[in-house]
Amino acid sequence: MNKKELFDAFDGFSQNLMVTLAEIEAMKKQVQSLVEENTILRLENTKLRERLSHLEHETVAKNPSKQRKDHLEGIYDEGFHICNFFYGQRRENDEECMFCRELLDRK
């Protein structure tokens, strides 16, 4: 193997390493994004569990249908969907959801 072939082989190897490094950086960013999303979801889950525990321990004697509606209103006011389409998902920027509002406005 002469010097030119050796140099070309190293150059090709270097190019492959650069491509691999770029792919690894992209995967690293994706994993970081997933970890951040996972952390947010864990915090939301913890908050929902605390809220559920709090509601289960309340011993307020209310009309059962009124109590259910109040419970749904509380969840909605905390920024979560209560409609069948997106139940439990966080409302982005606490924007109104027409499906959730329809449920809350029922008599």
Curated annotation (Swiss-Prot):
Transmembrane domains' residue ranges: none
Record's subcellular location: Cytoplasm, Nucleoid
Cofactor note: Binds 1 zinc ion per subunit.
GO biological process: DNA replication
InterPro entries: YabA
Protein's UniProt keywords contain Zinc: yes
Principal cellular location given in the protein's record: cytoplasm
Cofactor: Zn(2+)
Annotated residues for binding of Zn(2+): 81, 83, 97, 100
Coiled-coil segments: none
Record keywords, A-Z: Cytoplasm, DNA replication, DNA replication inhibitor, Metal-binding, Zinc
Pfam family, one: YabA
Gene Ontology, cellular component aspect: nucleoid
Superkingdom as given in the UniProt entry: Bacteria
Keyword Secreted: no
HAMAP family documented for this protein: YabA
Role summary: Involved in control of chromosome replication initiation. Inhibits the cooperative binding of DnaA to the oriC region, thus negatively regulating initiation of chromosome replication. Inhibits the ability of DnaA-ATP to form a helix on DNA; does not disassemble preformed DnaA-DNA helices. Decreases the residence time of DnaA on the chromosome at its binding sites (oriC, replication forks and promoter-binding sites). Tethers DnaA to the replication machinery via the DNA polymerase beta sliding clamp subunit (dnaN).
UniProt similarity note: Belongs to the YabA family.
Subunit and interaction comment: Homotetramer. Interacts with both DnaA and DnaN, acting as a bridge between these two proteins.
Protein name: Replication initiation control protein YabA
